[in-house]
Amino acid sequence: VVVGDFDSLEGRPPRTDVRTIALPALKDDPDMLSALKVGWSAGCREFHVYGGLGGRIDHTISGIQLMALLARHGASGYLYGDGLIVTAITDGRLSFPAHPVPEDGRMVSAFSHSDVSLGVNEPGLKYELKDGTLTNTVVQGVSNEFRDGVDAAISVEHGTLIVTFPIEVALPQVSRFHEFGGDIGELDTAVSKLLVR
């Protein structure tokens, strides 16, 4: 499925042999959220967004917020770009298998997306935070490091963390501490009602 408003497309429109959902350019939901909603309605609960980092900073921040939205509904999302992966976890754990770590591929960071994240643990990392509290106004989780050949994890008992790690690292196993409900909303194909005409 190809989803978008195609407002920045140069050249020919998308292939006609692929299901295409064309959205109005003057809408409320960004294209990425619309694409996630289409996937969600088809039963997807793990999303990989390539090219979701870099370019416009507002799009990058939007993508990070969407990873948090997915995590808060019990799904997983990964933004890929410039040698980095960004994901989010809510009330759960990301377990990274032991791996050889090149000197330039050690950095892993965790930031609180929620106002407060409680019970944050980072076993196996260079700085092993235990039962910590992170907030979204104080930076405490930046530039931690994987250790060569050591299993590692990042977990949060209550709250949402944004986690960044090198693209060379295998995706973590995700476990959640409880069931999540709800959905991320229905696809909105209408022109924004907030538009000033």
Q: What is each residue range found by the language model?
A:
Residues 19, 24, 74-78, 105-109, ...:
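A glycine-rich helix N-cap at a beta->alpha junction
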Residues 17-18, 43-45, 73-76, 105, ...:
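Short coil/turn connectors at secondary-structure junctions
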Residues 50-52, 80-81, 111:
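Short beta-strand segments
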Residues 25, 84, 115:
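Residues that form or immediately flank small-molecule/cofactor binding pockets and catalytic motifs
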Residues 12-15, 42-46, 74-77, 116-121, ...:
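Generic detector of short, locally flexible boundary/turn motifs and exposed helical patches
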Residues 89-197:
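Long, charged alpha-helical interface segments
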Residues 1-73:
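Acidic/Gly/His-enriched mid-domain segments of enzyme catalytic cores or analogous surface patches
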Residues 69-86:
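Short, acidic/small-residue loops that bind anionic groups at enzyme active sites
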